[in-house]
Structures are given as C-alpha cells and as structure tokens.
C-alpha cells in the first residue's frame, strides 16, 4: 500500500538561492581594468599546474553575460544570491586608485539583481588576493595587507551598501592557509607552518576590522563570514581517536569559528601552537578588537565530513609541521561517496553542524551558503537537449531533510544556497566537475537549464518539496 505524500515545508521567508564567486565566473576582457590576482599570476607562470591548462581568464564570462545570467536567476526561482567582488577589479594594485570600470560593473550588476527582488549577499574575498600585495610584501604574511583589505572593505561598504542585504568578509579563510602554506597546492605554495599561522591570524584580524568598518559606515548593515564547518568524526571511541577528531576540528573549523563568533581563540589550539613556537607576534589591542567585533551571522559551507584516527606513526622531527601530525584520514567502510569528486556524502553532518552552532555558539543566525554535487561528464545524461541530473536533485533533497530536522529542533538557519548557479571554473580542476543548475557550453558560452534548475524553481516557489 502506497503511503500518502506529504510536504517538507521550511519557515516563512526562508531564502532559496545559490552561491558563486567573481574569480570563478567573471572572466577577463581587454579594457576591463582588472589587475592580476594570485590566480591570474600563477596561471601565467605555471599553467601546467592547472587541469588542461584551463586558467582564470576562461571562466563563465559573467562580466559580458551578466544580464542574461540574472534573468536565469529569476527563471530558476532564486530569492537569494551570493556572489563576490574581486578586490583586484576594484583596486588593481590592491590599494590606491579605484578602477572606474570595475566600480561601475558591480554597481549595475547589484542594481539589476535588486530590481528582481532577490536578496543580495556579497562576499569581499574568495581566495583572490591582488598579486601586487603578494609581490611587494608577502601578502597575508604582512600586516600591511590587513590594512589594505580594511580600506578596500570600507570602500565597498560606502559604495554599495545601499544595495547589499548581507556582507561577507571572507569565504572559507582556512583554505588559503592550508593549501597555500601547508600543502603546496595553492599559490604561493609554501610549506611553512609559521607562515600559515601568521596568515591565519592576519586573515582573522582583517575580518574583524571589516566588521568594525561595516558597522561604522552604518550600524544597521549586517556582516558575517563563510566557513566550511566540516565536522570531524573519530574512527572509534578510543581516547586517542577522540583526541584526533577534536584537534582536527580545532584546526579546520574552530580556528576561525571561535574568534569570529565568540571573539576568542580556543585555548587548546593556542597551547598547541605555543608548544611548537608557532605563535605569531600579537598586539593585545588586536585581540581586544577581535573580541569586540564579532560577526552578525554565519555562512556555512558543507560538502563532506572528516573521518580521522590517531596517527599511526610519530612525525619525522626534521620534516615541516603539518596538521597530519595530530590526526590522519580514516576511510570508513561502507561510506556513500560521490565517485566523480571522491568525497563522502553524509547528510547527517549538516544536522550535527546545526546542533554545534546551537549548543556552543549562541544559536547565532546562519545560512547554508554552499552545498552541492560536482559530476564529471554530465553530457552523457542529456535527453532531449536537457541534462537529467536527478542525482543532484536527490543529493539536495537528502541534505534538506537533515536541515529541516535541524530547524525543527531549534536551529537558527535562514536559508539554503547551493553551489552553484551555473557551471563555473574550479581553481585547479577547471571544468572537470560540473555543479550548476544551469549548464554552460564552453565552446559557445550558451546557457541551458538542467532538470535541477526547473526543480529548484519549484522548490523555491513551494518553500519546500513533496516526499
């Protein structure tokens, strides 16, 4: 006997949309006045490190096609949209004279988005430091970059504040720390733990200064930070495994979550760094500023869990310090996985994140700002001219069930934003894995809705979905 279907409904005024970033969608065009960021420069000197040598100049041509793309936001039912301003499009050298073409571009884009009744969230930094600041002073290792960022942020608040509903200081600030200073995976591809810690500290200080500047420009402006709050699960309840998971979350999540929301750093993390002589020089006034200027809300990105165990081997005393000295990945038998991306799919992790925020971070307001499924070779799922991405729809539904359960249990979540609106360029993988509700034909730049794009419109219109 078939059970009657029922609706999973979300709270009134719940936001539905997607997230993207300027570096991954805009592209570069003659006369646009944009300066090089780290990715532009790195691609110029080491194109072989990018899949198929697909660089940041390719992307999804949003700079030229923004009007069509905004119409597609409407067609896919967006009530919210998160994008980013490219620092080097506004200030080609990171500071100094603003680029009039860049300033005007974002103004017209934001005005058009708002004219469609879409809630606009704008991120100020998505891994895209102006290269001039890296070249002249080692980028985020130099405190002068912190002040350059503060001035750039204030300029944006003053220039676009009348159009932006929610500001974001940084997207996933732990990622450049890990991949740029621990793992030789992002520029400046160093392996230097002391530099990594200094970069993390300066990034947090910059975020707090931006919060201060935002509220100085207008106390009613709302500003937050987007963090990938990947929960860490121990292999077992053995004390060594439990400790490994706790330390993994210290580095991965709490290193930015605690100072951003609580205004303080976790004492255990500070002690670990002190024992290894990795603490940077800290001005007590800076710590007071971090304490006083916490965020108004959180953006949470969630794709996969971490599963860890205690390290099996003692670290080589002559090797550089890596966080894997404290924990190592654990491959759980029977896990569900996205074979295209190699990531575990674990929907309950989203519920666990919500509980953590509720119980340990004052149930601060938050939105799920990234969640999605990247798939390679989606063209094989095309029928009658449209990609039938039922796997993506199922992925979203499965996560929304857990999010709905969390909200029912008191989570203060105000919206769900997928990654991403249109197939976009990924930092080192180019267009290998497609995430969009809208298909991008790289050869023609034609945009075509996938099945998920039509479904997402229904999801938004119904404020939920039928089981």
Task: Give a label for each model feature.
Residues 51-65, 141-143:
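Active-site mouth loops of central-metabolism enzymes
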